[in-house]
């Protein structure tokens, strides 16, 4: 391969200098990225690779379906809960189990707590340092920082010059100690960083504030699910009873005091996303107003299943509607059916798996998980020490899911594009007001269709979705209290708990709007045991390698045509890949074409 044109509109040229970033980060294991840059340091080819095999689908075969949630929840320790929820929904769908209204509301609150928490932690503690230079904050004027805070977030109480001076002094002592800790190995002199010292100081202060609030919001999981991470779920409902006269002993049922605690944490989250998170994203974006790279597939093909039904089992009441948009046509949204084998298929032509016919895709109900680790003839290195992958062959442990044959992007940005296009008034007001604030500060006149499909737009969508989730949680809490006051304390339906009540064979699916995008689990049950289990998680969609037709996935597409200041300091690669929300910090090595180490960075 030198230059090829993909069916989904990308011109790939791997003749230029190769830069390898390995690992970038992880969601279910590690991710590697290789790019080719031309003589102007513009990315002309991108290769995204999942470098660890999960294998949970194999582990689950022959197990009790009622236990599946506890296994799949361990797929990830950060997006904790969304896989468990998808699993219990899949089993309930297969066995035609309907959960009580209170169980639905409690699950909704737990799911939205995860969404809010994950988005806040992602932005402040994983992604912000791709935009924010904390060392530069030492040059800031605390008084000017206070004025900036009043301009972009006037309702935030911690905004005095003295407050920012204290933060700056703490940061100064940290830097002068020579132990930068979480800020070590950053490219702080890279010209890709554009913020003023005052904006850097404000964002660094909020980085620290977010550390405090994120540990408070997850206490809701401990109340409803017993712990965090990995709260408990159950097929048929939720594992927490309601008794308004109960005490506060460990393991006691929910009472009003605990429910009031839940409401207080939701209200704190609502205020933080409104007064800090969203204003921060808008303020930071104004310094990067010309950096509208990274849109990739979000400019053309997006997909989601929809979630957060106001009335359980009625998809028409989803507060974030699903669907698919192709070719950037926001005027036409196609329905998505997870049960349709013509719509959702996974391919393995470039994945380290075997299929009976690798030119064809398989629906998850018929999915096969048989590993086949084989490197292409143009791979540089060995099986255990790869220097450069051969993207013309198999090169990833991630399969290639496609919707009606199309590579699509999933995630909060996809959900917001879909809901803006479908007239969701809450989403429209959020997007329009945020873009108006951005245009005013930046002196631009961007439309939603110009601004959203970008790395910055992807980051903004997460902030807006976090706040929407906080607003929905308040409604869920009020409805739950109303049910309890009306005498309804049911939280589980155990009519079909006994496997003797199940059919000999059954199949089902469970769908969740996970923090990183469309999350689906498909199950086949035979003789009371799991016969087949397949997950298509958000990073499977976004991080997929090429399919048999040559279409590239969302990660690869998002990097195309991005200019880099210094390829040996891949700020731009990390910035865009992190906008998809990688989960955990891990060490990153950057290597030249012959494998020589050029730099080492710790991705935060």
From Swiss-Prot:
It is found in: Cell membrane. This enzyme recycles the H(2) produced by nitrogenase to increase the production of ATP and to protect nitrogenase against inhibition or damage by O(2) under carbon- or phosphate-limited conditions. It is a peripheral membrane protein. Heterodimer of a large and a small subunit. Ni(2+) binds at residues 76, 79, 583, 586. Belongs to the [NiFe]/[NiFeSe] hydrogenase large subunit family. It holds the Pfam family NiFeSe_Hases. InterPro entries: Ni-dep_hyd_lsu, Ni-dep_hyd_lsu_Ni_BS, NiFe-Hase_large, NiFe/NiFeSe_hydrgnase_LSU. Its EC number is 1.12.99.6. Keywords: Cell membrane, Membrane, Metal-binding, Nickel, Oxidoreductase, Plasmid. GO terms for molecular function: ferredoxin hydrogenase activity; hydrogenase (acceptor) activity; nickel cation binding. The lineage of its organism: Bacteria, Pseudomonadati, Pseudomonadota, Alphaproteobacteria, Hyphomicrobiales. GO terms for cellular component: plasma membrane. Disulfide bonds: none annotated. This is Uptake hydrogenase large subunit. PROSITE patterns: NI_HGENASE_L_1, NI_HGENASE_L_2. Binds 1 nickel ion per subunit.
């Amino acid at each position: 391969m030198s230059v090829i044109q993909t069916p989904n509109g990308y011109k790939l040229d791997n003749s230029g200098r190769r830069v390898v970033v390995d690992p970038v980060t992880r969601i279910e294991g590690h991710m590697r990225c290789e790019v080719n840059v031309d003589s102007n340091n513009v990315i002309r080819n991108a290769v995204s690779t999942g470098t660890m095999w999960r294998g949970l689908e194999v582990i689950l075969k022959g197990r009790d379906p009622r236990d599946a949630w506890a296994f799949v929840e361990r797929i990830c320790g950060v997006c904790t809960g969304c896989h468990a929820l998808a699993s219990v929904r899949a089993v309930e769908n297969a066995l035609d189990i309907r959960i009580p209204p209170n169980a639905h509301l409690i699950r909704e609150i737990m799911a939205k707590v995860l969404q809010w928490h994950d988005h806040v932690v992602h932005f402040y503690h994983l992604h912000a340092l791709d935009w924010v230079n904390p060392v530069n904050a030492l040059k800031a004027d605390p008084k000017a920082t206070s004025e900036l805070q009043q301009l972009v977030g006037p309702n935030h109480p911690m905004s005095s010059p003295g407050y920012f001076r204290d933060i700056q002094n703490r940061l100064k002592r940290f830097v002068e100690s020579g132990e930068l800790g979480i800020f070590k190995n950053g490219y702080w002199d890279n010209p890709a960083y554009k913020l003023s010292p005052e904006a850097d100081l404000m964002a660094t202060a909020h980085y620290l504030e977010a550390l405090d609030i994120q540990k408070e919001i997850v206490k809701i999981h401990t109340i409803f699910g017993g712990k965090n991470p990995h709260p408990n779920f159950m097929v048929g409902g939720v594992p927490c009873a309601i008794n308004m006269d109960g005490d506060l002993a460990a393991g006691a049922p929910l009472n009003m005091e605990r429910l009031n605690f839940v409401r207080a944490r939701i209200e704190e989250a609502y205020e933080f996303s409104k007064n800090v998170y969203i204003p921060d994203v808008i303020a930071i974006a104004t310094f990067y107003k010309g950096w509208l790279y990274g849109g990739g597939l979000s400019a053309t093909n997006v997909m989601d299943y929809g979630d957060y039904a106001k009335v359980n089992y009625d998809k028409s009441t989803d507060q974030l509607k699903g669907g698919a948009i192709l070719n950037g046509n926001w005027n036409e949204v196609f329905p998505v059916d997870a049960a349709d084998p013509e719509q959702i298929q996974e391919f393995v032509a470039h994945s380290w798996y075997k299929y009976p016919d690798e030119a064809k895709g398989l629906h998850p109900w018929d999915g096969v998980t048989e590993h086949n680790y084989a490197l292409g003839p143009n791979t540089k290195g060995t099986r255990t020490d790869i220097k450069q992958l051969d993207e013309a062959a198999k090169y990833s442990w991630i399969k290639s899911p496609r919707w009606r044959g199309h590579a699509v992007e999933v995630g909060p940005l996809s959900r917001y594009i879909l809901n803006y296009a479908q007239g969701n008034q809450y989403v429209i007001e959020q997007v329009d007001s945020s873009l108006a604030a951005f245009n005013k500060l930046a002196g631009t006149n961007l439309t939603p269709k110009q601004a959203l499909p970008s790395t910055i737009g992807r980051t903004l969508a997460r902030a807006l979705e976090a706040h929407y989730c906080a607003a929905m949680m308040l409604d869920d809490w009020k409805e739950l209290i109303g049910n309890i006051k009306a005498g309804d304390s049911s939280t589980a339906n155990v009519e079909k708990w006994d496997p003797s009540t199940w059919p000999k064979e059954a199949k089902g699916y469970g769908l969740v709007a996970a923090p990183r995008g469309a999350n689906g689990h498909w199950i086949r049950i035979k003789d009371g045991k799991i016969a087949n289990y397949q997950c298509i998680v958000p990073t499977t969609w976004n991080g997929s390698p090429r399919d048999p037709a040559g279409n590239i996935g969302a990660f690869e597409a998002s990097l195309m045509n991005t200019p880099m200041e210094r390829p040996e300091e891949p700020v731009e690669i990390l910035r865009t890949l992190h906008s998809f929300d990688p989960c955990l910090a891990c060490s990153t090595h950057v290597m030249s074409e012959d494998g020589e180490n050029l730099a080492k960075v710790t991705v935060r």
